[in-house]
Every structure is written in C-alpha cells, then in structure tokens.
C-alpha cells in the first residue's frame, strides 16, 4: 500500500470509530437483532452477528470520491453491512414444492443454489437478496437514500469496465434499488438482452419483504437467461482463479 493510501486508511479508522456506535444501533434496530456488532477488519467472521467491514473497500471508495468523505463513509459502511448479513431464512419445504425431484435432503442454501444453478447462481441470488434488503432498509431514511444515490451516480460509469456477467449483476442491483435509472444502451447487446428479459422476472418479486423461495426461483430463471446470451464467466478460467486465490 502506498503512503497516500496508508494515510487515508489511518484517517478512515478514526472516522469509522466515530460513526460505528450509531451505525451499529441503526443496524440492530432495523434488523431486529441486538446482538449485531460492527467492526473494522480484513478477515470475514464466521458469526452471523459479527459484521466486518474490509478497510480496502473504504480506502478504494474514499480515495476516489469527490463527494463529502463523511457521507461516503456512512453510505459505504451501511451498504457493506447490509450485504455482509444473512438476514433471511431458507424455507426448505417451499423450495421442495417448487423443485420436487431435485432437492431431497438438501437444507443449505449454497447447496441448493449449486444443484439448481451451478457455480454462478450464488452471485445472482446474493445480488437479488441484498438489493431487496437494501431497498427495504434505505427507503425509511431519506438522508441515507440521498447519500447512496450520490455515491452510485458518481461510480456508475465504472460498471462499463467490468466483465459481462459483473455488468449484468451491477445493473440488476440498480434496477431493483432504483437510486438511479440505469441506461443500458452503452453495453454489449448480449448484456442488454439478458437484462431486458430479467426485468420481466424482477416485476414478479416481493419488494416489501425477502421471500427466499421466490428469489431462488428467479435466480434459476436468470441463470438460464445468462446461459442463452453467453454472458456467464468461462468455467475453466473461473476455477483457475479460485485456485489462485
């Protein structure tokens, strides 16, 4: 890490500690969990009640922004905290009713997704779940909604630099959260076509509460769409990348 980023991280640690108690209380209240804790660290926790914010994410975001640093800090921490939690439960019986012959004795959501969608379904599932959770969470706070709208507007152009599948996921997020109205015409035809089909599926989802079975079913449909338009990552390169990590 260069000296500029080291200095930024030192300041970020101080700023994070100032807002941590208030953000923790906000998360505890909205997620109805007094045991939630929020801290700064580089390693994920195995506890669902322990939310860890990676400093590199804050450094990268804050070092690039032209917006108010305190607001960007608050918005980024809330966004990352929502996406780090698993604030939902799996209704195995409901899923088995939908996918009758495929989920015998399967209880874990990651196993369910692997069976039904292969290695990439988890990314679509996560973006759908967390986009809905963020939409539910943020709509109650006009100031927070405004902060996040500014952050996403500033960074929106960066989406074009991503791979096709990552572009698809990012644009799904924006289509659900509606902080901004994403324009699709600047993307490859395959990505735009996959998104346009997926938007019809988004219209069927519940945005007042997370329905896991509904999201799993949507994920299966969206992965099929991604396959048809050939925007999923190359599986061989994906596995090689995992091994390197």
Language model: regions and residue ranges:
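Short, functionally important secondary-structure microenvironments
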Residues: 1-245
